[in-house]
Every structure is written in C-alpha cells, then in structure tokens.
Amino acid sequence: MKKYLFAAWLSVTMTTVHAQEPNIPRGMFGAPQVDVKFDEYKAAPQGFDQEREGIATGTVKLIEYQSESVGTIRKANVYLPPKYDASKKYSVLYLLHGIGGDEWEWVRDGGVPNIIMDNLYADGKVADMIVVMPNGRAQKDDSRAGGMGSFRAFGDFDKDLIGSLIPYIEKTFSVYADKDHRAIAGLSMGGGQSLNFGLGHMDVFAYVGGFSSAPNTQRAAQLIPDVDKVKKENKLLWMVCGGADGLMNNSAQLKAFCDENGIPCTLINYPEGQHNFVVWKYGLYSFAQLIFK
C-alpha cells in the first residue's frame, strides 16, 4: 500500500511541477541528506543554448513505431545532425522527459536540444550521433495527463524502449547497433528511468546520465548489485542536479555508493540550480560532449 500511495503522491506532485515555464523552480522536496564530494562544475559558455547564424543546422523529425509491449503505435522525436548522411554510421543518445512531459517536452518546453547540439557540432565538440526523444510513458493513453497508471507505465518503458523503439531506430536510420554506441539520459523522472534502465541493461547502454533524477531512482544497491560488472561494462555514469533542488539526494546516494566502491561516477552540483531546464540544458550540453569518445 505504501508503494502505491507514494506513486500517487509523486505522480500528482511531479505532474504539477512539470508543464510550466521552463526556467521557474520545480520539484522542491527538501534538503539532501547524503554528504558527497561533488565533481568540478565548469560553466557552459554564454549562448550555448541560443541560435547562431552562419552554422549548419540539424532537423527534428517525428517518427511512429509499433510497440509490441504496449500494443499500439507510439511516437518519438529524432534529432538528425547537420548534413546527416545515410552512407555513414551514427551513435544514438536516447533522451528522456519528465513525468509531466512527452516526446515533445525537450523540444517545445525549453530544452532546445536541437540548438544545443547544432552549436556543439559547429564547434566540433561532439561525436557523430542522433538524439531520440521518446515518450517514456509506456501505455496506450500516453498523454501528459499523468496519474498512478502513468507512474507504473514509466517503470515499464524499458520493455518498449529495448523491445521496439531501439530496433525501429536501428532499422530506419544509419546507426550502430551495439551498446558501445548507445547512451541514455533524461531529466527528473526520465533521469530516474535512465539510471534504472541504463544500469539495469548494461548489455544495451554503455553511457548513462541522470539530470535532477526523481525519486523513482532505485537505491544504489539495487542499481548496482555487481560492482565489478559496472566497472567493466559501464563507460560513463554522469549526473547533475541543482544545488537548490531538493531532489539532490537521489543522485547523491548513488554517487556516495560509487565512491565507496571505487566505481567511476560524476555528480555535478549546479550552483543554486533548481528543478528546471537551466540545469537540464547544462546536463545535455555537458553529457553530449563526453559520450562516444
């Protein structure tokens, strides 16, 4: 019963704090309780998330795929980089939204992933990749309405992601089809999903990122039952959370566990950052530069 009461509380609360203006405070749930040593914060340059004139730009394409686990046609947005060339291979970043979002949250609600990626490409700071922004709510009614059913559907999304979406992407676009060329990251609820799925399926994803990860994040001992396996198979475990965000503890407990067990793990404390796209844009900007290299 407690699990379902928590699910209801989280669903209502997080749905309320999402779907608002992109830069206002969201998700304030109390102070962090775990003491950790944060990694160095390096500020993004001014204008990293602003359109620039005179550079090549990518495109965002809405795709539809048949979901075997959900039993319906589902949608995702795909960012194709400037001068996408079907004759060459690309890596793939799966970028997840929060509990109040959908496949459009990153694109329309303030994340500007296409602009961030275009600028990184122009500066030669990222490896060749496409970015897939799915709907992480694995149920037939996958609208932003939320509710307890949606909370459960977020937990089931790995079946749809791994069983249907990834095969569709690898059949439709010119991408590599191995774990070393797949990364997963997300914001808030999507950050929790990314940590759960990325560490739970290390045969599928080599790079894992969590931006202000929500309370759906499993406890560290559940995420990492085999320390040696993570050390061997994971290439990057990277997190960021705002210093003024009460959800910091979700990331801090994982960072503390990793430090205690000698697992490479990064946790950035974004100065005075809150639960919004100011932090999440920084997360994408930073994480994208570290993967597939």
Q: Where are these predicted regions, by residue range?
A:
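Sec/Tat signal peptide C-region and signal peptidase I cleavage site
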Residues: T15-A19
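Bacterial N-terminal signal peptides
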Residues: A7-T13
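General helical structural elements
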Residues: F6-A7, G30
